[in-house]
Amino acid sequence: MFENLCTLPLSSELFTQALHPTEPILSVGLSSGHVQCFRLPAAEAAAEDEDGDTSVVSTGTSTIDTEWRTRRHKGSCRTLGYNHDGEVLYSAGTDSLLKAAASSTGQVTSKILIPNTNTDKLDPPTLLHALSPQTLLLTTDSCALHLYDLRDNSSFKSGKPAQTHYPHDDYISSLSPLPPTEMSTSGFSKQWITTGGTTLAVTDLRRGVLVKSEDQEEELLSSVFVGGLPARGKYGREKVCVGNGNGVITLWEKGVWDDQSERIIVDGGGKAGGESLDAMIAMPEELEGGYGGKCVVVGCGDGSVRIVRVGGTKGVVEDMKHDDIEAVVAVGFDVEGRLISGGGDTVKVWQEKVEEEEEEEEEEEQEDIEDNDDVMGGGGKHALERDSDDSDARADSSDEEDGGRKKRKKKKKGKKNQVGNGILKFKGME
């Protein structure tokens, strides 16, 4: 179970977010063209500063600090992505510029104009992804999928991609890398899944577009690869989960890309259809224990964040609210294992809920054991042979001790109920 740790207000509408691979750092791209980088507090520090007397965590160790903020693009910033070591932050905007910046300072180190092979007009980007230290993928409104070789500085500076493919007839809405094969020598992905319009496609770094699915007759919006699923009948252990525009997740067997194999209803929506599933991320393995199987986190068009079990008994296992109106357009997990959801003009940080009740029960059981030892320890056989009057006296004493424990338990519960979800203090906000 997750609980909301804090809410981070933004100066304008969120279009995209990216999480640093090794540090608790969040970068956001806004409709105003700004890119802003925040440092989140360490999970341990935030937990230590919570107490029952206040709902505001305001100590210096638990603030969200602005590392830097800049107007990076004219128009909106549509997409962001870190490279594999987190040293470089790539951004692309409706000005059709792709920029690389030092992630620690925000200083631009290189920029290119995204080409449009069909017309002389600008071709705004939709997604970017650093597939490996050598390859950057960029998709555009014109359905193009550009591959930039980062080892060839002259190509990157001139804005000419090493390869361009057209896997779909509509703009590319999601991009998910497939894991490298056992025969891979580099350890990096060379194939990836894309969705665009009503189709799914697989593209290879060396061979281009390998396969394109049948028309699904429903809009495909988000996707993520999930491995380690339980094998069941004809279904394998590796699948791609695809979020649709009608509130349904479709499951696709790896290697069987012509059509979907299973469906999970996330939002029924009645006759009008369900809410769109705009963003999706696989849940880290260390957080899956409480949900009984492999799960994905989905950002929905109604402002909810839903955890969906895709292995075993499938279905929604938790429903959280990010916003009452605005859609959730981005979800991800930071290096501390916290869930970050973004939509509208806010970002929310969610942390796995600590089961305080279980801890209290363990403490009470330990108190019972100690109390019983006190009663039995002094008398031995002689205590058991006392007359009935002594037994009645011990019973009365035991009732008083039990009453004391119940009072202590009530006090603990009272204190627990005073704890609220904190709103962190923010530094460097404009």
UniProtKB/Swiss-Prot annotation:
Region feature Disordered, mapped onto this chain: 356-430
Subcellular location as annotated: Nucleus, Nucleolus
Basic and acidic residues bias (residue ranges): 382-397
Keywords assigned: Nucleus, Repeat, WD repeat
Biased composition (Acidic residues): 356-374
GO cellular component, one term: nucleolus
Major location category of this protein: nucleus
WD repeat windows: 9-48, 72-111, 117-158, 215-262, 272-318, 323-360
Sequence ranges of Basic residues compositional bias: 405-416
UniProt record similarity statement: Belongs to the WD repeat WDR55 family.
Designated name of the protein: WD repeat-containing protein jip5
